[in-house]
């Protein structure tokens, strides 16, 4: 499975997507990292993260044998992602808070996502919006699906 988006690619984010609604599983979201203290600013464009929503508020998330489980049920993923070599902090079941999301990188063994204990918490207040379109590179213009392949 190739990465859906690469560093430096330009995307369009719908900032109104989640004004009335909440992110859904499998949607690709853009978000700022959570501030570690009140003086830290988190709204710099260079700090924007883009990941796929895997777990929703209040759900129990676990990764075992390379598979994602939500509330004890194995999830049949929409795309053909590689099996995860490590569940990180999700080896043990995690219960998400009422405003917390569990996100995964499409490059499943990257570990730069909610499995990593040092990765930022993703809460609704930090979500910028839904990634709806890739603009650059021009050869891959279109929706940011996991089926897209990087061309040489």
Q: Model-predicted segments: where are they?
A:
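Extended hydrophobic leader/signal-anchor segments used for secretion and membrane insertion
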Residues: 1-152
